[in-house]
Amino acid sequence: LMFSLEMPHQQLVMRLLAQLSGIDYQALRAGRIPEDKYTEYYAALDRLDSLDIIIDDSPAITPAYVSSTVKNHMADGKLDAIFLDSLNLMKSGIRIDRKFEEIDYCATELKNVARENNIPVWVAHQMNRGIDYRGNESRPTLADLREGGEQPADVVMFIYHDRADDKSINSSSLIIAKQRNGPTGEIPVYFRANAFRFESAAKARL
């Protein structure tokens, strides 16, 4: 189940097709699929259909709305995971004056949804803009999360690209900055920009 506050349903599906097929996103948008990519395209359509992804792009999503929607879907059949993009666009649904308090409230309520339904909840969240002005010291930390929200999280991960490294603009790191029940650290990854897809660095070298 995917709650998308960042982009509409159609745009999200197009990006998923690009990720699954490896076909250039702009080519998919324009309907110009290379003839030698039709096999990958139809395989991606079949794969997307088999994943049975439910996308909810309702505006002004609140924790209460997420909770009730999850319960309704759980009654119809088990959900494997919940994704939400993004935390900073959520509304609390109650009166909270300060934005960081609203973010913390929403994050805590989403944690409750995860525990009540015994299901993982993955939440995207923005970084503070100040990180862009730190030059070569721009490696993200928990303090860089915009308006907080990290306290209730079991795991916090960042995607980081060292802009001082000109060897490969697509080489990045998955930083595990917090893990309540496990180790932290970094994993090298490779970003295929035309398909909006991250891969393990080892796989990308093959």
Outline where the language-model segments fall.
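Residues immediately C-terminal
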Residues: 89
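Short, basic, glycine/proline-bearing loop/turn elements
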Residues: 52-56, 95-96, 127-134
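Extracytoplasmic/secreted cell-surface and envelope-processing proteins
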Residues: 92-93, 167
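Active-site glycine- and acidic-residue-rich loops that bind
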Residues: 57-68, 97-104, 137
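Hydrophobic "anchor" residues on beta-strands that sit immediately upstream
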Residues: 81
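Phosphate-binding/switch region of NTP-binding enzymes
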Residues: 101-206
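Cytosolic-facing regulatory segments adjacent to core modules
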Residues: 1-78, 92, 186-190
